[in-house]
Amino acid sequence: MTNIRKTHPLLKIINSSFVDLPAPSSLSSWWNFGSLLGVCLGVQILTGLFLAMHYTSDTATAFNSVTHICRDVNYGWLLRYLHANGASMFFICLYLHVGRGLYYGSYTYSETWNIGILLLFAVMATAFMGYVLPWGQMSFWGATVITNLLSAIPYIGTELVQWIWGGFSVYKATLTRFFAFHFLLPFIVAALVMVHLLFLHETGSNNPTGIPSDPDMIPFHPYYTIKDILGFLVMLTALATLVLFSPDLLGDPDNYIPANPLITPPHIKPEWYFFFAYAILRSIPNKLGGVLALVMSILILAIVPILHMSKQRSMMFRPLSQCLFWLLVAVLFTLTWIGGQPVEHPYIIIGQTASVLYFLIILFLMPMTSMVENYLLKW
């Protein structure tokens, strides 16, 4: 008798995606982050759902409802901090996942890569709107500053900002719609994840060598399921440690002050995982230029496949490109640090230098290095 998992209309989809899926035998731990992102999304949707049962999206009560969740709801503090720090884990896994794709040339699967970029934008939008919901000082001023950037768009900018705000400033209508979108977007993200996997399973996974692995495949289960479970345990342990020992480590103390439109915080900044993009935005002394640089800092990923000049797919056997890749990582760490600092000397010039380097490495140095490597290998 044929196994039910191979014949049942629903089970056979799951079977071909997670059980009998042929996978390259050489996948390293860098391939764990896709499944870790799935776990992060699940944790965020579950904790978010329970938080939404107690949260009120009204300017008069939003801040107090979050306090109520932490103080009066059974394990409400745990839900709240799992959700807040879960977002940080989500972005750590996201950036490592994208970095893995860049290093090993996974971007040559253009459909999977482009859906991934779309997912990155969707998750960033979700996280930004979630940061507004507690209605603390940084929530209010962060929302005001970031949405106001759209006013830099010629002709329609001002009307667009007022349309998003639902009035002439960030107030009740803004908070209500941000809550609605923050609730809705994760489900759209989940749908996009399925499309992402659909395209991935059309081509099969890449592997560290970048060499086609068709002759050497192994079943996903049990080899990679057990490997993924180890990844889950490591990540959930890290998340639990963060939540139980230092839940406010990655947050902003200003967000424990209720939103006040009359008092501006000394340093308005987003959550730490947006610091690199925020630093690029601030490094250009022109509003429209800054907004374009901000968008391009993520959108540049879409042209990476076009800039691939190497005859090899992966960077595994390309030491010059490896040096550039790790320089890019160092630049991103520098930008992340600068994004959290005040706008004063020497941070301004460091941020501007790092921003120029970021675009220079991706747009010029990496393709040129690839061509040099091709020449050295007489290809």
UniProtKB/Swiss-Prot annotation:
Source taxon at top rank: Eukaryota
InterPro entries xrefs: Cyt_b/b6_C, Cyt_b/b6_C_sf, Cyt_b/b6_N, Cytb/b6-like_sf, Cytochrome_b, Cytochrome_b_C_euk/bac, Cytochrome_b_N_euk/bac, Di-haem_cyt_TM
Residues binding a ubiquinone: 201
Gene Ontology molecular function, alphabetical: metal ion binding; ubiquinol-cytochrome-c reductase activity
GO CC annotation terms, alphabetical: mitochondrial inner membrane; respiratory chain complex III
Sites where the protein binds heme b b566: 97, 196
Extra information: Heme 1 (or BL or b562) is low-potential and absorbs at about 562 nm, and heme 2 (or BH or b566) is high-potential and absorbs at about 566 nm.
Annotated protein name in UniProt: Cytochrome b
Organism: Dermanura phaeotis
Gene that this sequence comes from: MT-CYB
